[in-house]
Swiss-Prot record:
Taxonomic lineage from the root: Eukaryota, Metazoa, Chordata, Craniata, Vertebrata
Disulfide bonds: 25-61, 35-51
Assembly: Interacts with NDUFAF5.
Record field: transmembrane: none
Natural source organism: Mus musculus
GO BP annotations, alphabetical order: mitochondrial respiratory chain complex I assembly
Domain of life: Eukaryota
Keywords: Disulfide bond, Mitochondrion
Signal peptide, first to last residue: none
PROSITE patterns assigned: CHCH
Signal in keyword set: no
Chain location of the short sequence motif Cx9C motif 2 per the record: 51-61
Protein name, as recorded: NADH dehydrogenase [ubiquinone] 1 alpha subcomplex assembly factor 8
The CHCH domain, residue ranges: 22-69
Amino acid sequence: MSVNGAVWGRVRSRFRAFPEHLAACGAEASAYGKCVQASTAPGGRLSKDLCVREFEALRSCFAAAAKKTMMGGS
């Protein structure tokens, strides 16, 4: 396999794992989504870093889920 093919193989495997990782972080994804939704509702004002706490919680959870998968855990 070419070097370029190996890179795309890793990218595809990460994309295939994305739904699993997201499912493992349902509460965090929901909290972030609710924050963004409330900020974009009529009268709401979405701005940078408005939902940063929720985003960081989701990012941390997602990274932990990805690491767990890479280590062979389920």
